[in-house]
Amino acid sequence: MKEQVSQTKKGSVLRASMYVAVLIGLAAFLIFSILAAITFGNADLSLKDVYSVIAYKLFHIKSLSAYAEGAVHDVVWLIRLPRVLLALAVGMALSVCGVVMQAIVQNPLADPYVLGISSGASLGATLAIMLGVGGFLGGNSVGVPAFIGAMVTSFAVIAIANMGGKATSAKLILAGMAVSAVCSAFSNFVIYITNDKNAATEVMKWSMGSLAGASWSRVGVMLPVTLICVIIFWTQYRNLNLMLLGDDVSITLGTDLHRLRTFYLIVASVMIGFAVYCAGVIGFVGLVIPHVIRILFGTDHRRLLPLSALLGASFLIWCDVACRVILKNSEMPIGVLVSIIGAPCFIYLLVRKSYGFGGSK
């Protein structure tokens, strides 16, 4: 008996040390990804030029004052670095929201857009592009209506799911499907009656996702929102673990998941709303990344959330780099590339017989 206990303790220590090692490794890889990604782009810049701009802006080294302005400064500081940091924030947001949504609806196939957020955002963007709604917002004329559409859709789904009793996982999924269908129908109707091919092309490009509109102002909004929401969810890992067991079990343990579920949905919707505002709709990140981490480290959200955040951030950074360099003098929509990578990975996850969700095999 004592030998079994000692072996169990030894195994848990090994798993904990492995988790810490992987956490540190992913954090180091994320830092490396940021530093490496800013060296890629259509402009042919040397490593010295790139890092000299960063060093001057961060530490104000007088010997590098030549990089305080000019074309090299603008490319590195105003275009590349904000884009990399925005990819970090959006990738982190999508991955963490994927983890949370899968726990909330108790469905391993759920993604951040399960509540119809993508359809609501697309409707907002369609109205902005096709009808000129939000034209007074200037550079945010598409992003702000898309954000509003995403948030309105989320709250509508939550309200519908709470009609006739408390919201359950099944009611949330069904309400999301219904609202998503309505938003898609209205989007198609607006495109049909407007009959503007150029505007329709713009809607299609927006729906594919892009980080080309990155700026320091967007990073200044997206990054703090993401970090705050991630911290909120990480402090709630015990309740997220309970959600995988179901409402009946949680009630017997003295926890009412109904209010928590609504709160988590609102926080996740805010985070996804800002992600849509900054980058459009990018799929599969919030679906595949949580599964990869869950396969390696199980379903404990104390580990699942930070690891998913780090891996998702690095993944989207490198996807964006690929989008910039694959096509010469052009840029591939990041949503297309992520889907090309994510779909085969997701199919592989589906056929794995040894993989379970929430403790079920």
Question: Where do the language-model regions lie?
Answer:
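Alpha-helical transmembrane segments in inner-membrane proteins
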Residues: 2-361
